[in-house]
Amino acid sequence: MKENAKENELVKKLTNKHYTITTAESCTGGLLSATIINVSGASDVINCAYVTYANEAKENLVSVSHETLETKGAVSKETAAEMCVGCAKAAKADKIGRASCRERV
């Protein structure tokens, strides 16, 4: 696959700062992590990647509460926030951030 300048820049910046990244994805199906992993040198910055499409995976791997999934849905800002926090705890991350799909109507 063709490497994109933005992905290269991200990997370079993370490498220079000695940062690693862990992702937790759902509706993107691993596209974010795959895009980063496609860059040469990504093994220095990728810690792990969770693809938690099923609700059970969200609960078991990244600690999303069953209640949140039942009341807010799998594709909601609340679920995305819990995925972010759970992923960070599982990976023992120093910093967290998130990007999510638009909430479905």
What are these regions (language model features)?
Residues 1-104:
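Short alpha-helical segments enriched in small residues
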